[in-house]
Regions:
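Macromolecular interaction modules
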Residues: 1-215
């Protein structure tokens, strides 16, 4: 199984509602027509998340959303890319966006909190309030799931293990957990490209940036 990530910036400040409608109601559902995609979810770096983050860098600072797809294996990547081309050709793509970081990453670690009934491999499919993500150095996933608000964690790495992405799935209060996890990952955060919480994207609730968006 591979994780395909996209850290996405919406380049038009007035375009967040349109972007969310496109992604949640058109683009994301279409991905599940591809055999070998078992999971797809997107989270938002809301203003409240930005205020709670532990680290950022020039490359990742512009992003607003993180999407994660789980692919059966690398053979799923060609049809995944081909679908993107077909949607572009059919004018079913959102132009005012750019990926500041994207691509496939190998799964190198999985953890589940002892209190949850599911296996570590099932954690992403379990409902959560959001995630806490560390991009850059590897962090010990066990230290994350030891926190009572974390159901589990998955860790991904690029092919040369130069960049790790650790995703902790938070089923407790997100920002309380984020405060505690920021202390847990403090040493790694000094070298991290980005570290912080991301909120769950709920259907038809896309107003996080409304007060920041010109009308």
């Amino acid at each position: 199984v591979l994780g395909f990530f996209s850290f996405t910036e919406v380049t038009d400040p007035s375009g967040h509602e349109a972007y969310n409608a496109w992604h949640q109601l058109d683009h994301l559902p279409e991905q599940f027509t591809i055999e070998g995609i078992s999971f797809g979810q997107r989270w938002v770096r809301s203003p409240r998340c930005t205020a709670a983050e532990a680290a950022t860098t020039e490359q990742l600072d512009p992003f607003h959303y993180m999407t994660l797809y789980l692919l059966r294996d690398e053979d799923v990547i060609p049809p995944f890319m081909e679908l993107a081309k077909r949607l572009h050709a059919a004018d079913r793509f959102f132009a005012a966006r750019r990926a500041v970081l994207s691509g496939p990453f190998e799964i190198v670690g999985q953890w589940a909190a002892p209190r949850v009934a599911v296996s570590a491999g099932a954690v992403p499919f379990r409902p959560s309030h959001g995630v806490y993500v560390v991009v850059g150095p590897a962090v010990d996933g066990q230290t994350l799931v030891d926190h009572p608000g974390v159901a589990g964690a998955w860790q991904f790495a690029d092919s040369i293990r130069a960049r790790h992405l650790t995703v902790a799935f938070v089923d407790g209060e997100l920002f309380g957990a984020a405060s505690a996890l920021s202390e847990v990952v403090a040493a790694a955060a000094t070298q991290a490209e980005w570290a912080g919480p991301l909120e769950r994207v709920d259907a038809f609730r896309w107003d996080w940036f409304a007060t920041l968006t010109p009308r």
